[in-house]
Amino acid sequence: MTQLAAARTNPSIIMVVGVGGAGGNAVNHMWNLGIKGVDFMVCNTDQQALDKSPVELKVRLGSEGLGAGNDPENGRKAAIESLDVVRQRFEASGTKMVFITAGMGGGTGTGAAPVVAKIAQEAGILTVAVVTKPFAFEREQKMAQAEKGIMELKKYVDSLIVIPNEKLLEGMDKPLTMRESFALADDILKTGVKSISDLIVEEGYINLDFADVSTIMKGAGYAHLAIGHGSGKDKAKEAANAVIASPLLETSIAGAKRLLINITMSEDILSSDVDNATKMITDKAADNVEFIFGTAFKEDMQDEMTITVIAAGFDEETDDSEEAEEPAAEEAAAPEEPEAQPQPQPQPQQTQAAANGGKKPADPDDLMAIFEILDRK
């Protein structure tokens, strides 16, 4: 079945919200890149961090502005204190999709991100979180806080992508300083969010729009993000294998019932290259996988292919005996997370967005850092 993509009449339906220090740094990085078609907001308990941010839309969580002291409970209470302000920001923007990015394990990101997500969910906004877990050299207490925060956050988002910081170091060919390690983590948060938002806001030969992304990510639970790059004769195989291997995440494509595939390539790429790459990826997913794909040409790419994949719709084991604490006791209980169980199909079902006159996308060269990590694996 083929769906035709609606014309993009409002490119600013996406808001990226950075919560806490790491989330704010990722959003600052995206802002400085001049990304179009996306609104940005930073939320923090630290007034100094907000003052340093170039982002125009800022929300101080709580009344003191002195930070959360690495205590998620302080971050949670500060966010609850600012519920109305955050809600008003969402309502005024007309946002249909919110990305929440944060580093889990500290005070503000861990405690406040679930509150912000709950506000977005209650407003009927498609809510996706992209968060990091601490490095191994950080305290065990911080990892425990991160795990608890992730479980709480998962209750209030449609899709959750978790990036373990430790995975970032596995592909490096030299030791990194602590400053370099955290800068790399911030860049990966930015890359994860931007790779998804680009699918909607960038123009391509076969476009993907908000409805396409919503089909894959709404009510999906844990999701998987992978980016692969290939060049030369075996570019399709190289790019697809990089996506399948995906060293950056703890999840994988295996068992996914929903796939969103976006391919950026040079104009001389053969249709068979696209077919081969797509088949390699879908073969690793569930037998009844539903997939949507888009393509874009980039004129300065020479015999190259870049593939971005979002995989979702995994079978997850749930434990109803442990209920996470409500992030906002003053608020009504959040609706139960929808089951990510698409109806089985006899074979993979492909949904395409409509062609858009061969318009070329904006330059995605800022993703090359992650390609270098992937290529080293």
Please identify what each model-predicted range represents.
Residues 1-377:
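Tubulin/FtsZ superfamily GTPase core signature
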